Amino acid sequence: MSTLVSLPGATPVAAPDYQSLERPLNFTESAAAKVKSLIQEEGNLDLALRVYIEGGGCSGFQYGFEFDENRAEDDLAVQTSGVTLLVDPLSLQYLMGAEVDYTESLTGAQFVIRNPNAKTTCGCGSSFSM
């Protein structure tokens, strides 16, 4: 069963039936390890990393990350190494098949989303277009 949903300014699309997929989103070991470290620093083991999409950025949509204690009934929850990644259904339709990773390089360390649905991305990698 699918529902039509969209972000402001975007064409409505059928929301994916993520329950029928084994792993609609990949949450890497590297990302899970970093999230686990940050959660331990916060001292709140009930926290999960929420990834979401919102309008904005130089390419039209942008990724957002925040810690969240509350899981909605229709959130997708992906577990890796005991750490939970949450995604709401609206954001999930733009993130199906994506990978959430954490990378460290000479230029810095950051969470990275490799999104096969993005047609273009900006230079910093935090915004994209569909």
Curated annotation (Swiss-Prot):
Family matches, as InterPro entries: FeS_biogenesis, FeS_cluster_insertion, FeS_cluster_insertion_CS, FeS_cluster_insertion_RrpA, HesB-like_dom_sf
A GO biological-process term: iron-sulfur cluster assembly
Residue sites binding iron-sulfur cluster per the record: C58, C122, C124
SUPFAM superfamilies the record matches: HesB-like domain (SSF89360)
Co-factor binding details: Binds 1 iron-sulfur cluster per subunit.
Known cofactor(s): iron-sulfur cluster
Record PROSITE patterns: HESB
GO cellular component, one term: cytosol
Record has Iron as a keyword: yes
Molecular function, one GO term: iron ion binding
Keywords in alphabetical order: Iron, Iron-sulfur, Metal-binding
A Pfam family the protein falls into: Fe-S_biosyn
Function summary: Required for insertion of 4Fe-4S clusters for at least IspG.
Family note: Belongs to the HesB/IscA family.
Subunit composition and interactions: Homodimer.
Protein name per Swiss-Prot or TrEMBL: Iron-sulfur cluster insertion protein ErpA
Organism: Stenotrophomonas maltophilia (strain R551-3)
Name of the gene this protein is made from: erpA
